[in-house]
Curated annotation (Swiss-Prot):
GO terms for cellular component: cytoplasm; nucleus. Its main location: cytoplasm. Residues 79-130 form a coiled coil. Residues 1-337 are annotated as: Interaction with tcf7l1-A. Keywords: Coiled coil, Cytoplasm, Developmental protein, Neurogenesis, Nucleus, Wnt signaling pathway. One of its GO terms (biological process) is nervous system development. The gene is dact1-a. Expressed in the animal and dorsal marginal regions at late blastula and early gastrula stages. Expressed predominantly in the anterior neural plate at neurulation. Expressed mainly in the ectodermal placodes, including the eye anlagen and the otic vesicle, at later stages of development. PANTHER family: DAPPER HOMOLOG 1, DAPPER-RELATED. It comes from Xenopus laevis. Residues 1-10 have a biased composition (Pro residues). Residues 455-485 have a biased composition (Polar residues). This is Dapper 1-A. Involved in regulation of intracellular signaling pathways during development. Specifically thought to play a role in canonical and/or non-canonical Wnt signaling pathways through interaction with DSH (Dishevelled) family proteins. Binds to dvl2/dsh and impedes the degradation of beta-catenin (ctnnb1-A and possibly ctnnb1-B), thereby enhancing the transcriptional activation of target genes of the Wnt signaling pathway. The C-terminal PDZ-binding motif may mediate interaction with the PDZ domains of DSH (Dishevelled) family proteins.
C-alpha cells in the first residue's frame, strides 16, 4: 500500500492497518501542525481586527481636516469596517462574559447533577441562576431560532451566535446524548440576549459584512495562513455551517463541549481557532457560500433542530415520569402481610405474627395488625403510647371507640412499661400489681368505694387500664370505661373484624378486670376465623401459692390468664402480690419456646390434630339480652362462693383432643403444693371475697364450683404473670383442667387454634377473647361496679399449661398463647 501523505485527511491515516503506528505519529504531527496553523490564522484575524479597531478609534479621536479630507476618499469604506469591528468587539465581550458564566455554571451544574442522581429526580429549575448552562433536553424548541437551547456547547454560543454558527449548529446524535445528561433548563436570559443580537445582525447587516467585508483585509493580513483555515466549516452531519471569519469563531470553537459534540474523536485542543474544526469535521468546504444570507442559514439550522425535538420530548417525558415515581409515599401499612385480611392473616399465620411482634409493644409506629399482637400487659404493667394507636384504624367499628379511648388516655405514653423480667429482678410484683389494680380502678368511671379501697397505692398512674387497651388499638370496650356502659360495650363487639375485636375485647377484659366489670359469658364455639371473637372469659381472682420454677420468655409460650378479682381488701391484695412475686421468680426457670414435658409432647400434637375448626355459633340478636343479663350473672356469681366462679365454655367431649390425661409425678406434687397454698390462703381470703353464682352462658357453659385447687392455680397463674405478645395465636384453648379431683374435670375450653401450623410450633392454646354474649340471667347492675377484675397473662410452655389446666381453678380465666 502506498504511504499516506501527510496532507491527507486524518481519517484515511487511521484506516491503514500496515502503518498504524506510523500513521498515528504522522497524524499527531499533522494535528499539531494544523493546530498551530489554526492558531496563527486566528491570531492573524484578531490582529487584523485589532488594527481595524485602532483605525476606528484614531479616526474618532483625531478629528481634523486631514481626516475630513480623507473621509470622502478612503474613510467611507473604513467607517463601515469600523462599525463591523465595533460589532465584533461587542460580540467578543459578550462571548467572554458567556465563558466566565460558563466556567461557574459547569461547576454548579456538576454539583446539581450529583444531587439529582442521588435524589433520583431532576430539578429543571435550578439552572436559571446560571445563565450559560447547557440546555436540558426537557424543553422542546419554541422555534427555529431558539434551537440554541439544545446546544451542547450551549453557554458559549447561546447569547451571541454570530454568523460563525447557527443556533443549532451542534445538533448531532452525540450532542443529543449530551443534552440528555444535562438535565438543566436553558436560561431565558441567554436566549433573550441572543435574540437581541440576532435583531442587531439583521438591522445592521453585521453578519454578511463581517464575513465579506473584512475578507480582503484578512487575506492581506493572513496571506501566509493556509487557505483552508479561511474557509467555512461544514460539520459531519452536514447540517451546520461555520462561517469564516468571525471574531466569535476563534473563541467559540475552543469550547470542549463544542469539540466533543462536533468533532467526536478529536481532542479538545484542536479547535484553538475557528479553523480547527475544519480539520476535525473532515468536511472542509473551501470558500463555502460566504455571501449566503443569515436568514437562510438560520432556517437551515432550525430545520436541523426540529427532528431532534421529538426525541427530546420523549426523553423529557420519561424523565418527568421518573421524577414523579422517584419517592413513593410510604404508608403505615406493613411492607408484607401474611394475608389480605388482617384478621385471617393473623389467625392463620400466628407463628409468623409471633416473631414479628416481639418488640411491638414498645414501638410508637406499630400497625394495628402488629398492635393486636402486642404483648398484653402482665397484670397491666406494659403500656403502649396511645398516640400511635388511634391513627391505626383498620377496624371500622373500632374507630369511634379508638377516638374515645384516645381522649380518655392522654398520658399513657408517660406510664413506664415494665416487663416480667423487671418484676423478677426487682421482686416487686406486689407493688406493681397493686399499682395496676389502682390504675385500672381509677380508669373505670363507675367504680365503687370498695374497689377504691382495694386500689390504694397512689403511685400507679390512673391511665393504666387505658394503656392495656391501647395495646389492643382502641378496643371498643375501653372506649366506654364506665361499667354502667357495659351494654354499649357488648354491642360494639360484632365479629366483623375478628382479630381486632379479639384484641379489643382482651384489652377490655384487662382493663375491666380491675374496673368492676361483670364476668362475661361467651358463646361456646367459634369458627377458625371467628374463634377469637367468641372466646370465653372466666372470672377469676388470683390467690398466691407456693413458688414454682418457670422461666418467662417474652417471645416464647405466652399464656394469658385474665383474672377478675372480686372485692379484696388492700392487705389481701398485697399478700397475693407477695406470693405472686415469689412464684414468678421460680417460674422463670422452666419455659423455653420448645420446652415441653415428655408426657405432654404427644398430647400437644394431638391437640393440634384433633381440635377441629369449630363452627361459629353467632346469635347477634342475643346481645341486647345478654347486656341486660350480665349484671345478674355477676352478682349471683360473686355471692355463691369465696371467689368468683367461672362460666366456662365447654366443648363437646367428642371434640376434645386431650379430654383426660394421666397425671405425671410432677403434676401430683404440683397438686399437693397447690392444695396447701390454697388452704392457707383460703382461710385468709374467705371472709373477703364475695360470692357470685354464675348462670350457664351456653349449652357447654356451666357454673364452676369452687375447685379444690382454685387457689393454688390462681397463685400459680399470678406468679407467672407476663405480658403476652400474641393474642391471636390460637382461637380456642383446650381445657386441660379436668381431672378426677376437680369439679370442672369435664370442662373443656373452647377448641384449639385453627392455625394448625402454629399449634405445632408454639403449641398455642387460647381462650377466645371476644364477647359473644349469650342470654344471661338478669342480675342487679350494682355488682358490676363492685367486681374488680384483673387480667393476668401467663406465658407458659405446653407442659405447664396442661398442668395448670388440669388444676382448673374456679376463679381463673386462662388464655394460653403458646
Amino acid at each position: 500500500m502506498k504511504p499516506i501523505p501527510s496532507p491527507e485527511p486524518p481519517g484515511q491515516l487511521r484506516l491503514t492497518p500496515r502503518r498504524k503506528d506510523k500513521g498515528e505519529a504522522e497524524w499527531e504531527r499533522h494535528r499539531t501542525r494544523e493546530r498551530l496553523e489554526a492558531t496563527l490564522a486566528g491570531l492573524a484575524e484578531l490582529d487584523c481586527l485589532r488594527h481595524r479597531q485602532q483605525l476606528l478609534v484614531q479616526n474618532v479621536l483625531s478629528p481634523g481636516t486631514h481626516g475630513q479630507d480623507a473621509a470622502p476618499t478612503g474613510d467611507s469604506p473604513r467607517s463601515d469596517e469600523q462599525k463591523l469591528l465595533e460589532e465584533n468587539i461587542s460580540l467578543l465581550k459578550k462571548q467572554l462574559n458567556c465563558l466566565r458564566k460558563r466556567d461557574a455554571g459547569l461547576l454548579s451544574q456538576l454539583h446539581e447533577l450529583d444531587k439529582q442522581i442521588n435524589d433520583l429526580k431532576i430539578d429543571s429549575e435550578k439552572t436559571e441562576e446560571t445563565d450559560s448552562r447547557p440546555s436540558s433536553g426537557f424543553y422542546e424548541l419554541s422555534d427555529g431560532t431558539s434551537g440554541s437551547l439544545s446546544n451542547s456547547s450551549n453557554s458559549v454560543f447561546s447569547e451571541c451566535l454570530s454568523s460563525c454558527h447557527s443556533s443549532t449548529c451542534f445538533c448531532n446524535p452525540l450532542e443529543t446524548s449530551l443534552n440528555l445528561t444535562d438535565g438543566q433548563a436553558k436560561s431565558a436570559e441567554d436566549f433573550l440576549e441572543w435574540l437581541d443580537y440576532r435583531e442587531s445582525q439583521h438591522e445592521t447587516g453585521t453578519v454578511r459584512c463581517s464575513f465579506s467585508a473584512p475578507h480582503s483585509n484578512s487575506v492581506e493580513v493572513t496571506a501566509d495562513v493556509h487557505p483552508k483555515y479561511q474557509c467555512d466549516l461544514v460539520s459531519k452531519n452536514g447540517n451546520d455551517v461555520y462561517r469564516y471569519p468571525s471574531p466569535l469563531h476563534a473563541v467559540a470553537v475552543q469550547s470542549p463541549m463544542f469539540l466533543i459534540s462536533v468533532m467526536g474523536n478529536i481532542k479538545a485542543e484542536e479547535p484553538e481557532e475557528e479553523i480547527g474544526p475544519n480539520d476535525n469535521d473532515d468536511c472542509i468546504v473551501p470558500e463555502l457560500d460566504h455571501l449566503k444570507d443569515e436568514d437562510s442559514f438560520l432556517h437551515q439550522s432550525s430545520l436541523c433542530s426540529l427532528p431532534l425535538s421529538s426525541g427530546k420530548k420523549m426523553d423529557g417525558y420519561i424523565l418527568s415520569i421518573i421524577h414523579k415515581k422517584a419517592h413513593p409515599v410510604r404508608t403505615n401499612k406493613p411492607r408484607t402481610s401474611v394475608n389480605a385480611d388482617p384478621g385471617k392473616g393473623i389467625l392463620r399465620h400466628g407463628s409468623i405474627c409471633v416473631k414479628q411482634t416481639v418488640g411491638v409493644s414498645q414501638s410508637n409506629a406499630v400497625n394495628l395488625k402488629n398492635s393486636k399482637q402486642t404483648c398484653l400487659h402482665s397484670a397491666g404493667m406494659i403500656s403502649v403510647d396511645n398516640s400511635t394507636y388511634p391513627s391505626l384504624k383498620p377496624c371500622s367499628k373500632e374507630s369511634l371507640s379508638e377516638q374515645l379511648e384516645s381522649k380518655r388516655m392522654p398520658s399513657i405514653s408517660t406510664y413506664p412499661s415494665c416487663n416480667v423480667n423487671e418484676l423478677q429482678s426487682q421482686n416487686n410484683s406486689r407493688n406493681t400489681v397493686k399499682s395496676v389494680c389502682q390504675g385500672l380502678a381509677r380508669g373505670s368511671v363507675a367504680m365503687t368505694s370498695n374497689v377504691q379501697k382495694e386500689n390504694v397505692t397512689p403511685n400507679a398512674p390512673a391511665n393504666l387500664p387505658n394503656a392495656s387497651s391501647s395495646v389492643c388499638n382502641g378496643s371498643p370496650r375501653e372506649s366506654t370505661q364506665n361499667s354502667a356502659l357495659l351494654p354499649q360495650e357488648i354491642k360494639v363487639v360484632p365479629p366483623v373484624k375478628r382479630v381486632s375485636l379479639k384484641n379489643t375485647l382482651l384489652s377490655y377484659h384487662e382493663s375491666s378486670s380491675f374496673e368492676e366489670r361483670p364476668p362475661l359469658d361467651f358463646k361456646s364455639e367459634g369458627s377458625s376465623s371467628q374463634s377469637l371473637d367468641e372466646g370465653m372469659l372466666v372470672n377469676a381472682h388470683y390467690i398466691p401459692a407456693q413458688q414454682h420454677g418457670v422461666k418467662l420468655h417474652k417471645n416464647t409460650k405466652n399464656v394469658k390468664i385474665v383474672k377478675s378479682s372480686t372485692l379484696k381488701h388492700r392487705a389481701d391484695v398485697q399478700y397475693v402480690l407477695e406470693n405472686g412475686s415469689q412464684t414468678l421468680k421460680e417460674k422463670s426457670k422452666v419455659v423455653g419456646k420448645k420446652c415441653r414435658f415428655p408426657e405432654d409432647l404427644d398430647t400437644n400434637k394431638k391437640v393440634k390434630k384433633s381440635t377441629p375448626r369449630v363452627k361459629k355459633i353467632v346469635h347477634p340478636h342475643f346481645e341486647p339480652a345478654a347486656v341486660g343479663r350480665n349484671p345478674v350473672a355477676v352478682r349471683s356469681g360473686i355471692k355463691s362462693h369465696g371467689h368468683p366462679k367461672d362460666v366456662v365454655l365447654a366443648k363437646p367431649k367428642h371434640k376434645r383432643s386431650d379430654y383426660r390425661r394421666w397425671k405425671s409425678s410432677a403434676e401430683i406434687s404440683y397438686e399437693e403444693a397447690l392444695r396447701r397454698a390454697r388452704r392457707r390462703v383460703q382461710r385468709e381470703m374467705m371472709g373477703v371475697c364475695a360470692q357470685v353464682p354464675f348462670s350457664h352462658a351456653s349449652p357447654y357453659a356451666y357454673i364452676a364450683s369452687d375447685s379444690e385447687y382454685s387457689a393454688e392455680c390462681e397463685s400459680l397463674f399470678h406468679s407467672t404473670v407476663v405480658d403476652t405478645s400474641e393474642d391471636e395465636q390460637s382461637n380456642y384453648t383446650t381445657n386441660c383442667f379436668g381431672d378426677s379431683e376437680s369439679s370442672l374435670s369435664e370442662v373443656e375450653f373452647v377448641g384449639e387454634s385453627t392455625t394448625s401450623s402454629d399449634t405445632d410450633e408454639s403449641g398455642g392454646l387460647i381462650w377466645s377473647q371476644f364477647v359473644h354474649t349469650l342470654p344471661m340471667q338478669a342480675t342487679a347492675t350494682a355488682e358490676l361496679q363492685t367486681t374488680a377484675k384483673a387480667f393476668i397473662k401467663i406465658k407458659a410452655s405446653h407442659n405447664l399449661k396442661k398442668k395448670i389446666l388440669r388444676f382448673r381453678s374456679g376463679s381463673l380465666k386462662l388464655m394460653t398463647t403458646v
